Amino acid sequence: MPPAKRKGECPGAAPKKPKDPVRVPKLLIRGGVEVLEVKTGVDSITEVECFLTPEMGDANEHLRGYSQRVTCDVTFENDAPQKKTLPCYSTARIPLPNLNEDLTCGNILMWEAVTVKTEVLGVTSMLNLHAEAQKVHDNGAGRPVQGSNFHFFSVGGEPLELQGVLHNYRTTYPEGTIAPKNPTAESQVMNTEHKAYLDKTGAYPVECWVPDPSRNENTRYFGTYTGGENVPPVLHVTNTATTVLLDEQGVGPLCKADSLYVSAVDICGLFTNSSGTQQWRGLSRYFKISLRKRSVKNPYPISFLLSDLINRRTTRVQGQPMYGMNAQVEEVRVYDGTEELPGDPDMMRYIDKYGQHQTKML
C-alpha cells in the first residue's frame, strides 16, 4: 500500500524556502575592564560582569567572609558591638563609556540598565562540616551554618538610598561605621531624619539601614530575610534566571554621569565554632548586567554644567575596586547591530502660578 500523500504537497513542487535564521546581537568587542574605554556605535548594547565580596567584618586574615565572634550584652544601655562583628553593605561604582561629546544638545544619550543575572557564589562551601565546627553529637559531623539570613542586591544609576531603623536606639556603634545620627526612641520604628546614601563599602551596618522605599526611583533592589535560630540557608544556583529592571513605563535605571552602581549583602547565617561561639558567615555575589543606550531630553542647562565643573555633582563612592590592578570586573561585552524621556528622575518639574514651566534641582 503506497504511503499516504501529505496534505498540501504537490508532485514536482519546488521545496519550500527555509526560514531565515533568527537575528541576534553581533558580538563586537569582548574583554576586561579596558573595553569600557572603547567608543561604541549608536545601537550598541553593553554587558558588564562583576562580583561583590562580603563585608562581614573579617575576624582575621584567615577568616575572610566571617565576622568576629558575636557577643550579647546584658542590658540595652551597655550595647556596644565591635566593628568586626557587624555585617555591612557591599557597594561599588562601575564607570561606563562616555556617550556624549556635546552636552549642550537638546537630546543626549544615557546608559539604561535593562536586565541583570545574579547569583550567590560559593554556596557549596557550606557543605564543609569538618572544619572546627561544633559537633551535632559526640560522633557526628559539624553543625552546619544556620540561623537568621539576609540576601539583598541592587542595581541603579545612582547610589542606593537608605533609611535608618534601629533595634536599640541606645546602642553605641564603633568608629569606622556609619549609623543614624542623634537616635531617639522613634528611631526604633521610623525617623524620617535618618537618611543616607550608600557611598562607602563596609561602613553601613545592615542592622541599622534598609533601602528607602520612598526614594530609589532610579534604582532597583531585591531582598529576602528569614529569621530564626535553626533556619537553614536556602539558595538557588542557576544561570537561566533573568531579572528585568524596567519599571511599569518600560524604563530602566538611567546611569547618570555614565556610572553604574551595584550593592549587595548575603548573610547566610551563623557558623558555630567547637567552643560554642558563633560568627556571621557571608558569601560573594555575581552580577551580569545588560545596558542599552537611551535617548533622553537633556536635563542639564548650560549654567548647571558650568557650575558642575566647580562643584562636582557626582556622588563619590568608596567602593570595592572595579578598575585598576585589583579590578573585580570579570568581563565586559559590547554588541553593535540589530537592536521624550526626562534624563534625571531627581529633578522636579512643575508649572508655577504664572503658567510657566519650571525645573528645580533637588
Swiss-Prot record:
Query: What Pfam families does this protein map onto?
Result: Polyoma_coat (PF00718)
Keyword Nucleotide-binding in the entry? The reply is no
Q: Name one GO biological process term.
A: virion attachment to host cell
| Keyword match Disulfide bond | yes
Question: Which controlled-vocabulary keywords does the entry list?
Answer: Capsid protein, Disulfide bond, Host nucleus, Host-virus interaction, Late protein, Phosphoprotein, T=7 icosahedral capsid protein, Viral attachment to host cell, Viral penetration into host cytoplasm, Virion, Virus endocytosis by host, Virus entry into host cell
Q: Which domain of life is it from?
A: Viruses
- PROSITE patterns, A to Z: AA_TRNA_LIGASE_I (PS00178)
User: Where is the protein found, in the record's own terms?
Assistant: Virion; Host nucleus
Q: Which GO terms describe its cellular component?
A: host cell nucleus; T=7 icosahedral viral capsid
Gene3D superfamilies of this UniProt entry? Capsid protein VP1,Polyomavirus
- Phosphothreonine is found on 338
GO MF term list = structural molecule activity
User: Could you describe the subunit structure of this protein?
Assistant: Homomultimer; disulfide-linked. The virus capsid is composed of 72 icosahedral units, each one composed of five disulfide-linked copies of VP1. Interacts with minor capsid proteins VP2 and VP3.
- Describe the family membership recorded for this protein in Swiss-Prot or TrEMBL: Belongs to the polyomaviruses coat protein VP1 family.
Give the protein's biological function: Forms an icosahedral capsid with a T=7 symmetry and a 40 nm diameter. The capsid is composed of 72 pentamers linked to each other by disulfide bonds and associated with VP2 or VP3 proteins. Interacts with sialic acids on the cell surface to provide virion attachment to target cell. Once attached, the virion is internalized by endocytosis and traffics to the endoplasmic reticulum. Inside the endoplasmic reticulum, the protein folding machinery isomerizes VP1 interpentamer disulfide bonds, thereby triggering initial uncoating.
Domain comment, in the record's words?
Answer: A DNA-binding domain overlapping a bipartite nuclear localization signal is present in the N-terminal region of the protein and is required for efficient virus formation.
Q: From the Swiss-Prot or TrEMBL record, give the protein name.
A: Major capsid protein VP1
User: What is the source species?
Assistant: Simian virus 12 (strain wt100) (SV-12)
What lineage is on file? Viruses, Monodnaviria, Shotokuvirae, Cossaviricota, Papovaviricetes
